[in-house]
């Protein structure tokens, strides 16, 4: 929960994504600036918007405390033709982070590099959300485009 811990999670997440470009199918990159006094409420609103897309949250890690919930027995069967995972990375930084929309894999790679190089002293908040979370859980193509209409095919 401290800035060095958040920095480590951000770097680990962006590196994991950068190491799997063959798995990138869709992407969306957004960035914006808000006044400092609105930063927390804006971050919380974005977090709630993204988390509300989940059927349920199975694993959370807040302040280093991990908790699990949900019923792992009700998962669907994985199907290689329709199995997707969505990773959402929300970052609140003291400095402006200029990211461009990802029209292709190289632009996504550059945005991930920029995001991953955010200095720990600039990192105010971080949330990494992935869906699906459970073993064997499936996110179909229809569910993907319904929940994430801003995604662009790479």
What are these regions (language model features)?
Residues 145-154:
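A cross-kingdom marker for long, charged
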């Amino acid at each position: 929960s401290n800035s060095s811990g958040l920095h480590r999670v951000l770097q680990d997440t962006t590196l994991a994504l950068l190491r799997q470009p063959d798995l990138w199918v869709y992407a969306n990159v957004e960035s914006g600036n808000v006044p400092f006094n609105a930063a927390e409420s804006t971050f919380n609103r974005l977090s709630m918007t993204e988390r509300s897309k989940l059927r349920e949250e199975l694993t959370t890690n807040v302040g280093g405390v991990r908790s699990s919930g949900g019923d792992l027995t009700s998962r669907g069967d994985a199907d290689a033709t329709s199995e997707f995972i969505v990773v959402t990375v929300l970052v609140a930084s003291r400095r402006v982070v200029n990211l461009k929309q990802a029209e292709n894999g190289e632009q996504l790679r550059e945005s991930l590099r920029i995001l991953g190089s955010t200095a720990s002293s600039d990192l105010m908040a971080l949330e990494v959300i992935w869906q699906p979370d459970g073993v064997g859980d499936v996110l179909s193509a229809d569910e993907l485009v319904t929940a994430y209409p801003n995604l662009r095919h790479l």
